[in-house]
Amino acid sequence: QKISYAIPGSSLTASWVELGPANVGGRTRGITWDPNDPTGKTVWAGGVTGGLWYNNDIANVNSSWIKVNDFWQTLSISKIIFDTINKKTAYVSTGEGFGARAGIGAGIWKTTDGGINWYKLSSTNGFLYSNDMTIRTENNKSVIYAAIDANFYMSTFSNTANVGLYRSADNGLTWTQTLPIIDSANTAKVPFAPASIQISKNNKIWVGTKASPNGNTNRGGGYILSSTNGIDWTVVKKFTVNNGYGRVSIAVAPSNANVIYAFVENNNKLENLYRSDDEGLTWVTLAKPKNYEYRTPADDFTRGQAWYDQAIAVDPNNPNTVIVGGIDLFKSTDGGTTWNQISKWYNWNAKYSYVHADQHAILYKPNSSTTALFANDGGIFYTNNLGAADTANVISHVSKAYNVTQFYAGAIHPEIGKSFFLAGSQDNGTQRFTNPSFSNTTTATGGDGGFCFIDQTNPKFQITSYVYNSYYLSSDSGKSFTQTLIDNDDIGSFINPATYDNNLHILYSNSSRDYLVRIKNITNTPKLDYISV
């Protein structure tokens, strides 16, 4: 025990200092405007593994986010909603249902004092992954609907028994699964798995589905269902999704209950965008936004990630104005006949704003056609000038002190007292830390950052990585990483395990095959070879 306490950071009385990064942000799905702020500036957001936060002046890029609590049972925030009747009451669902081996949740949290104090609803212990959540007014009462899913946790697919749409008419005390079973061909007799929930202007509730992790034959992906009472459901539409994942995100026009948009995935890719002008009786296929970003097919603006990067929202005042998000953001002002790109993540010469890749949520400010929030793998972005978004840089990154970056690995400089280390993060590159306190970082290498190393005997040599077997070398103390040691995305894992021999200056990495990748002589002339195992 005394030996373990001698390891830096292992003492029971050790004090931890938050280092950031203060300028990066991270994957976010849950965002909402605070209805209790008469100025309309307060926003709540949650990282999918970074906890719950709020910002009192979202229009100010220098306004810092404030964390609510680092010690909830889970920090995986998926959705945040305020009660439509009692605006001091809000609910936060947890667990990221979309994505493989994502952050696991632990239920739904509630506040009745506007977010000062929070407590977990014990009735939701089995709600480990949530895709969506909303509140509908029924007979002058607030009724909560939560879309509960399953996902991998520690190599086990968990929460499958609780998949479904849960309804609570008593403020979260009790819940009832309300969706019907998929169909008689599914011998498991399991309910549809909800992916998205919308409430229309006439108070009808709509659900878009995804493939259920349970059952067989027809797994229920690619459907839209509706209900007038939240209990009895009608299948409105079944899209052709080849029995794949079939995730469907729906967006009902706030100003016109007849107008509904659907964003449909099929076998990972964009299947199509659809629109109905008669409450789902008939549907027309819309044009597909054209994206000319790096490695993005012109006919699939999700770049094969529609199962994951999927967001859609309709202008509160105009049913013909709609925004969709895949890798980037696109806006249509003619009901989906034509689209204009309004963000970029890679094409720096484009005329519109930089917005981080992988869109997960789009949220208009209530009653506003010009102001909106965007949540993605880079955190939170904001604009109050949507009308100019296709021709000007009007969307800002508003993630100051929003410390939700997802790190995989780190490397510490060996020099005593030197505040320098590298850390590889999910979709935010390998970050370079140079300060002993909470501060901004700089990007050493981009994309997804994985394992990284600083040679402990000759620290001017440093290594970063991208996905699979992509490793980069710096020989100038981390100032630049211009040498590629290996770039092979056919072997290894997404975030690929690796280790470094500081004495012999050798990098070893996983290949997911019957050999290891070895790169010798890192501090001189690196040489690549393979070791059979």
For the regions a language model picked out, list residue spans one by one.
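Beta-propeller blade termini and top-face loops
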Residues: 1-533
